[in-house]
């Protein structure tokens, strides 16, 4: 119970910095040079990239609003892998935990003028105890295109949102997690890692995202 209260408290503390992270990410993009080998398909009318000198709060609201109101794609999410870090768990626990997160989700997304990814999503999947766990939120990824094939992309960023779990009585819990991806054309393999302590947390979770 103490651990749960601690995690909830930490989540509540970290959630307010999410808009700052979004603003910081956009600021980095605005001051960095373009390294792509060829143009990418982005939203040329993206209002977020056109506005300078905005507050971090306004920039964050614009990012969310643009993603919601002017998405470039609608996405299907398919949870694929849950893996409990064997170096941080007793075998008796991992033997009985579920690692097949059956479920599905839906979202909208866009690429900004820098070719970086913004998305809003909601998913539901079977958790470690084989109970339904919903999660929804916002994701941002800085995108790199290391080859001449611009459809092949690598991403690194964060996701912020809210989840609810059966073993926490489905109390809404804010989350702030790292996000990474490998993408080709309309298909992305995205993943996050949930940090924790011994026998708690330390879970790798990944899903497929298909643009429709």
From Swiss-Prot:
GO MF terms here are: acyltransferase activity
- Signal peptide residues are 1-24
Query: Which superkingdom heads the taxonomic lineage of this protein's source?
Result: Bacteria
Comp. bias intervals (Polar residues):
36-47
Catalytic machinery residues? 84, 127-128
Query: Which cellular compartments is it found in?
Result: Cell outer membrane
- Mind telling me which InterPro entries this protein's record contains? LipidA_acyl_PagP, OMP/PagP_b-brl
Q: Could you state one GO cellular component term attached to this entry?
A: cell outer membrane
Name it. Lipid A acyltransferase PagP
Its source organism is Pectobacterium carotovorum subsp. carotovorum (strain PC1)
